Every structure is written in structure tokens, then in C-alpha cells.
């Protein structure tokens, strides 16, 4: 017979009573009556915040943008194939946020800032909300520093400043991504953190861009955020905000950042898909009523911080794709009205072999010469005027048979200036090379050449300068002024190179 010791039993009971925790844990839960097309309807999930994260039984996470009288509409961050009708859902009490750190540089991540490049986990000690409020008026200062793109047409006539939002707009296959990636390549050694956000692109296109960055040594100062065409609409919609949160992390640490959104047309389409599935009322072109706010709250996060916040900056060139050059469509007009200028890329110019295919006549930067160094201002003013006059004359010359000598000369100069703006892809130019190129063109040094020889002559001149006249680049870089000494050195270099060029060509 087992001996029962009352003192042991009483000790066990006493210990259990002391360990009893009276704390009641309240969990906000609901059930799934309906799921499909990346949308779940949740019944019984009371007191859920707008945009709160919710977690399903199978581990899938969703965002709750719609709170209705009898249910909550949730968009899923995944395919949701394992979510079953009647399964439970738990509110997390958190708004969507991502981890941030310096370790993200050189990595490829998705819209949830999770690495997808196979290089292992990214260490991060802090996090930021995906949707942060934009800096206020007092937190900003006016844009005054240039963000060099390395493209003559932009840096001379449509200059972009640090903290500006300059739209890149054009039809498909007109070189929009090339302009953006060249700008990122040109930031090498400029102490600028770059973020490339690819929304709804083909995986092969994104891989090509990443390879270009890696080959040219640009990946070490760049973060690539990508959600491909086969990603859920929710993640395509979130990707730009994730990129902005990463850029803000560096901006508020007194650094300069450049974030490219490629492209916001696809983000708007993903948002339209989400909204229609959530049964929100459609508006113009079936977009929901708040599609303007979708882009304005994203682009307003780009800023040039004031001195109290460390003078960091976030420059945002968004890309918009037009259909058959129609810039009066809903999304293009929205983004044009939000941004500080636009660069129009023309399919006609692209097909005519003028690349980058920038239509200088209708492109504009609302910051203007405030975002140029003095040396560029000195040479660029004449270029824009001469190209504008050439465009008018060219249209007139199509109908006139006999033109006087002055008009013929002006047309010849204009054709050579247009050649001067042509550049190969992934070959951005330093500001001193641009100043030399523009000065050569606007002062008529290329007028004696055949139109087809101009590009070759200028490429060889840019190669000749660093080896034979290195002091020219030193003066421009150190003083940022096109001084008389620099002009004399350049004139001498042009004269010497012209003799070499003509002797080579005559052979």
C-alpha cells in the first residue's frame, strides 16, 4: 500500500497556488468566411486598425485596409492557397514595418525587405514603418546641389537637384530604365546611396540591371527592391514604400540618397486590382478615388533636409509608362502634377537613333539652374537656345526650297549639336567631360566636321583630355567654374586634337 504524506501534497498545492498567474491575455481573433484572388473576408475581427497586420492559422500575413460594418477586407501578402474557410485569424496590433540597416547595401530584397539574392540573412537592429509621414515644410530646405546623371541632355538643360522629384515618362522601349540606371552608375564615388525599386518587371530584366550594377561596381552602394510580374498585387503595391523607408533611414542619417521607382504605372495597376477585389467604388479608368494620394504620399517623402536634420536628401525620379505618347491619361497627369518637372522620352527620336531619346523641347525641370554648378551654367545657356532655334528652323526648312547662307549654317550647327547629345548606354560622363563637350559644340569647333563624324570626334576628345591636359579637369572639379585658364587649355586641346583627328581620317 502506498503511503500518502499529507505534508508533500499540501506543499505541491501551495507551490501551484503561488505560481498561479491571474493575468488574462486578450487576443483579437476572427474567422474566414471567404478567401480568394488574394483577398480574405474576416468576420468577428473587432477593433482592427486601418493597415494593421493580421496573421492567419497557416502563417500567412495580410494587411487590413478595409473595415466594413460586418466584416474586414484583408489583402494577403502571399498566394493564400493554404488558408481554409472557417480558419481563425489573429490581429497582431502592428502596422507594416521593415528592418533597416547599412547591411542592406549591395543586396536584392523583396517588398518585405527579405533577401532574395541567396546571400544569407541581413543583420538589422532597428525597423521603420513602411508608410512614414513625409517631412514637413519646416524640415525642408530648397534644392541647391546638383544630382549629376552623367547624361549631357539632362545635366545641361533639365538639371536634377538633390531632393528633387523628376519624372521620367515615355512609351515602352524608349530607354526610361536606361536613363535611371545610368544615373545610378554615375553616383560612383559621389557618396550617394542608391535604391532601385522594380515593380511588376520581368525577372530577367531585373537580373540584367543587377548584373550591370555588379559589373560596374555600383551594387556596393545600391539596394535593389523588386517584386516581379508574378508577385501578388499587395506586394507590388508595397514595394515603392519599402524602398522609400530604406532611403529615409539613410536620409535621416545625414546621407544623400537616390531612389528610382520603375515604374509607378504598374504600382497603380496593382492598387487598382486590389481595390476592385475589395469592392471599392471605381473611378476614372477604373482606378479607385484615392489613386492620386497613393502616389503623392510616396513622392512627398523625397526631400532636401534642413541643417538641423543634417542636410541629408532623398531624390526620387519616378518612371511612368505612357500608351502611344498619351500624357493626358489619368496616372501620367497625376504624377506630372506631383513632381518637380519631367523628362519626356520620345519613341520617334529613339527610332531615329537619337539616344537617350530625350525630347528637350517639352522636358522641364522646375528647379532649373539652381541645381547646376557654375561651370555648367556658363556653357549650357547657349546650348538650349540654339537647339530651340534649330527645332523651329528645321520645321520651317521642310517647306522652304532655297535658304540663305546664315540659315543653312544654323541648321548645320543644330544637327551637330543634336549629335553632341547622343550617348551610349551605361557610359555616363563626368561634369568636366560634359563642359568640354558642350563648349566644343556651341562654339562651332565641330562645324567643320561631317555630321556623322561629330560623335566619334567628341569621344576621342574626351579620351585625349585626361591624358594630355589633366589640369582642365582639375580646375573644373576644384573651382566648379569654367575659368579663363580652363577655356584656354580646352581651346588648345581642341586645336591639337582636331589636327590629329583630321590626319587620322584623311588616311
From Swiss-Prot:
Keywords: ATP synthesis, ATP-binding, CF(1), Hydrogen ion transport, Ion transport, Membrane, Nucleotide-binding, Plastid, Translocase, Transport
Subcellular location: Plastid membrane
Keyword Nucleotide-binding tagged: yes
Binding site for ATP: 170-177
GO cellular component term of the entry, any: proton-transporting ATP synthase complex
Pfam families: ATP-synt_ab, ATP-synt_ab_C, ATP-synt_ab_N
EC number: 7.1.2.2
Function according to Swiss-Prot or TrEMBL: Produces ATP from ADP in the presence of a proton gradient across the membrane. The alpha chain is a regulatory subunit.
Family listed: Belongs to the ATPase alpha/beta chains family.
Subunit-structure text: F-type ATPases have 2 components, CF(1) - the catalytic core - and CF(0) - the membrane proton channel. CF(1) has five subunits: alpha(3), beta(3), gamma(1), delta(1), epsilon(1). CF(0) has four main subunits: a, b, b' and c.
Protein name, entry field: ATP synthase subunit alpha, plastid
Gene coding for it: atpA
Amino acid at each position: 500500500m502506498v503511503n500518502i504524506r499529507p505534508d508533500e501534497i499540501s506543499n505541491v498545492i501551495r507551490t501551484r497556488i503561488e505560481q498561479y498567474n491571474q493575468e488574462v491575455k486578450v487576443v483579437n481573433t476572427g474567422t474566414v468566411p471567404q478567401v480568394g484572388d488574394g483577398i480574405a473576408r474576416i468576420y468577428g475581427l473587432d477593433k482592427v486598425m486601418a493597415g494593421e497586420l493580421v496573421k492567419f492559422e497557416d502563417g500567412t500575413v495580410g494587411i487590413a485596409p478595409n473595415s466594413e460594418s460586418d466584416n474586414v477586407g484583408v489583402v494577403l501578402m502571399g498566394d493564400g492557397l493554404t488558408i481554409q474557410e472557417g480558419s481563425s485569424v489573429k490581429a497582431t496590433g502592428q502596422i507594416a514595418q521593415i528592418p533597416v540597416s547599412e547591411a542592406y547595401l549591395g543586396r536584392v530584397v523583396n517588398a518585405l525587405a527579405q533577401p532574395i539574392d541567396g546571400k544569407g540573412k541581413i543583420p538589422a537592429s532597428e525597423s521603420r514603418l513602411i508608410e512614414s509621414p513625409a517631412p514637413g515644410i519646416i524640415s525642408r530646405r530648397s534644392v541647391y546641389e546638383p544630382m549629376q546623371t552623367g547624361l549631357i541632355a539632362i545635366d545641361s538643360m533639365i538639371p536634377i537637384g538633390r531632393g528633387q522629384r523628376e519624372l521620367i515618362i515615355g512609351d515602352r522601349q524608349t530607354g526610361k530604365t536606361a536613363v535611371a540606371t545610368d544615373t545610378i552608375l554615375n553616383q560612383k564615388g559621389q557618396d550617394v546611396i542608391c535604391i532601385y525599386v522594380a515593380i511588376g518587371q520581368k525577372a530577367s530584366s531585373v537580373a540584367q540591371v543587377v548584373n550591370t550594377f555588379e559589373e560596374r561596381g555600383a551594387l556596393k552602394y545600391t539596394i535593389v527592391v523588386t517584386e516581379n510580374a508574378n508577385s501578388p498585387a499587395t506586394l507590388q503595391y508595397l514595394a515603392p514604400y519599402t524602398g522609400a523607408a530604406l532611403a529615409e533611414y539613410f536620409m535621416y542619417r545625414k546621407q544623400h540618397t537616390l531612389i528610382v521607382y520603375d515604374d509607378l504605372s504598374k504600382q497603380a495597376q496593382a492598387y487598382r486590382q486590389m481595390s476592385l477585389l475589395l469592392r471599392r467604388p471605381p473611378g476614372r479608368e477604373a482606378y479607385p478615388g484615392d489613386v492620386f494620394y497613393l502616389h503623392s504620399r510616396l513622392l512627398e517623402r523625397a526631400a532636401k533636409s534642413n541643417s538641423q536634420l543634417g542636410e541629408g536628401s532623398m531624390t526620387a525620379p519616378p518612371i511612368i509608362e505612357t500608351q502611344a505618347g498619351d500624357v493626358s491619361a489619368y496616372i501620367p497627369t497625376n504624377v506630372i502634377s506631383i513632381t518637380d518637372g519631367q523628362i519626356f522620352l520620345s519613341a520617334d527620336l529613339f527610332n531615329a537613333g537619337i539616344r537617350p531619346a530625350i525630347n528637350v523641347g517639352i522636358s522641364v525641370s522646375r528647379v532649373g539652374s539652381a541645381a547646376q554648378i557654375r561651370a555648367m551654367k556658363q556653357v549650357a545657356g547657349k546650348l538650349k537656345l540654339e537647339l530651340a532655334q534649330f527645332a523651329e528652323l528645321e520645321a520651317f526648312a521642310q517647306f522652304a526650297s532655297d535658304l540663305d547662307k546664315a540659315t543653312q549654317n544654323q541648321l548645320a550647327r543644330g544637327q551637330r549639336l543634336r549629335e553632341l547629345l547622343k550617348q551610349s548606354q551605361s557610359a555616363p560622363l563626368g561634369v568636366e567631360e560634359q563642359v568640354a563637350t558642350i563648349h566644343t559644340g556651341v562654339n562651332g569647333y565641330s562645324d567643320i566636321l561631317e555630321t556623322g563624324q561629330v560623335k566619334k570626334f567628341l569621344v576621342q576628345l574626351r579620351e585625349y583630355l585626361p591624358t594630355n591636359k589633366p589640369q582642365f579637369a582639375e580646375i573644373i572639379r576644384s573651382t566648379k567654374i569654367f575659368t579663363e585658364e580652363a577655356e584656354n587649355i580646352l581651346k588648345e586641346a581642341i586645336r591639337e586634337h582636331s589636327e590629329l583627328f583630321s590626319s587620322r581620317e584623311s588616311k
